[in-house]
Design a protein with these regions (language model features):
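Bacterial Sec-dependent N-terminal signal peptides
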Residues: 1-22
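Extended active-site neighborhood of metal-dependent phosphoesterases/phosphodiesterases
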Residues: 102-131, 188-284, 315-321, 337-371
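Active-site-proximal segments of metal-dependent phosphoesterases and phosphodiesterases across multiple
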Residues: 262, 268, 286-328
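Solvent-exposed loop/turn segments at secondary-structure junctions
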Residues: 47, 151-154, 179-182, 213-217, ...
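Acidic, histidine-bearing metal-coordination/catalytic regions of metal-dependent phosphoesterases
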Residues: 18-146, 167, 363-386
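Alpha/beta-hydrolase fold active-site loops
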Residues: 142-143, 171, 236, 243-244, ...
């Protein structure tokens, strides 16, 4: 009996140690990839200081020599967090890099004394190092991309649509909102779609995100900006890739702020006023005006009859008409709609369904979008010419 209890105690102790071990719980994944920089994000189960080691994409072993380290740090202090966000800057345009992530647990910090624990890192011994490539606008004459939306935590659907859209050959992926039904916790968010995205592409291929109305719901909703970064530092931004300037907007909620569902905690009308002020200036930027094609990424379409949709129509659409936008890509309605110009909207609006994927390619003279369903069948083809 004593031996049995001893064995049971040892197994329990091992289990506790295993639970206490620092691990990389989610990621890494790429955000805000541009010509000279990228943001790399991952999470750990405990507070840690974190860094990235960077190496050129040559034929040398990663272990050949000490690689330069880039820390998660702000105001001269290394960040201690479970959400590890590292911005790599001053990189070379159009260059492929290999990288490895590290986190070291911080056990205590008293006065000037810091006690550290174990280190967790991505594997570069049994597996090839992760890679990313910076962009080069002067050479990016053609691009291809894939758009999905309204996944609502259905990972099988996400995987199927990405495959049907040919994500492996695409330059980047766009998530156009409602990837979750609500934001409950970090674990729920990653489990709903991001773990799948990371396993498929997001550690090496960039993903750009337009927040939908369902990402604004739940007690974890205000944490969204911690995990998804943009060139503007906001949830709305301009993105120039190849011949396209993408205007990525944040739609906010679809009902009036006073609706009982929000319990008085939201102020999206005011938020969209601020976004409109930003948009008015952004549409005069050379990043936008110099692009052959101008495409809006916005979760809610400017029609449908609800308050949020009406806000899209009254606040954003007049500015887009004046700026001569070529196309708007939306979601939200869970059905496919190809709305041609008219009724006060001077450009086509494509409402992608939750069961279709947009497979797009563009050069300076043409923008082609195939709409493909779950079975891999093409349901529509949109061709824009310059």
């Amino acid at each position: 009996m004593k031996k049995y209890l001893l064995v049971l105690f040892l197994f329990a102790a091992i289990a506790v140690v295993a639970q206490d071990k620092l691990v990389i719980s989610h990621g890494p994944y790429l955000q805000h990839l541009g010509e000279t920089g990228v943001t790399i994000i991952w999470t750990t189960n405990k507070n840690a200081v974190s860094w990235v080691e960077l190496a050129p994409n040559d034929q040398t072993e990663f272990y050949l020599k000490e690689r330069p380290k880039y820390y998660s740090a702000e105001y001269g202090f290394k960040d201690v967090s479970t959400v590890n966000t590292i911005r790599l800057s001053n990189l070379t345009r159009g260059t492929t890099y290999r990288y490895r992530i590290y986190s070291q647990e911080v056990l205590s910090h008293e006065g000037t004394k810091v006690q550290y624990g174990t280190v967790a890192a991505s594997d570069v011994y049994r597996a090839k190092p992760l890679k990313f490539s910076t962009t080069d606008q002067s050479k990016e004459k053609k691009i291809s991309f894939v758009v999905v939306n309204d996944i609502h935590g259905h990972n099988d659907l996400l995987e199927n649509l990405l495959n049907k859209g040919g994500y492996k050959s695409a330059d980047f992926i766009i998530f156009n909102g409602d990837m979750v039904s609500e934001m409950q916790s970090e674990e729920q968010m990653f489990g709903s779609f991001m773990d799948t995205a990371i396993s498929m592409f997001a550690s090496e291929k960039p993903m750009y995100y337009a927040r939908g109305n369902h990402e604004t719901r739940g007690n974890f909703a205000n944490a969204f900006p911690q995990y998804f970064k943009s060139p503007s530092g906001k949830l709305y931004y301009l993105l120039r890739r190849g011949p396209i300037c993408f205007v990525v907007l944040d739609c906010g909620e679809d009902k009036p702020d006073s609706d009982i569902e929000y319990s008085g905690i939201v102020a999206f009308d005011q938020y969209r006023d601020t976004e409109t002020d930003w948009l008015r200036k952004a549409l005069k930027s050379p990043v936008f005006t110099d692009a052959p094609f101008k495409v809006v990424i916005l979760h809610m379409p400017p029609f449908g009859g609800w308050h949020g949709e009406d806000e899209m129509a009254t606040k954003f659409v007049p500015l887009f008409n004046e700026a001569k936008v070529d196309l708007m890509l939306c979601g939200h309605l869970h059905k496919y709609i190809h709305q041609k110009p008219g009724n006060g909207v001077d450009f086509p609006v494509i409402v992608n369904s939750n069961t279709t994927v947009v497979k797009a390619k563009a050069d300076a003279e043409s923008l082609n979008l195939k709409i493909i369903n779950e079975k891999g069948e093409q349901v529509d083809l949109i061709q824009l010419k310059k």
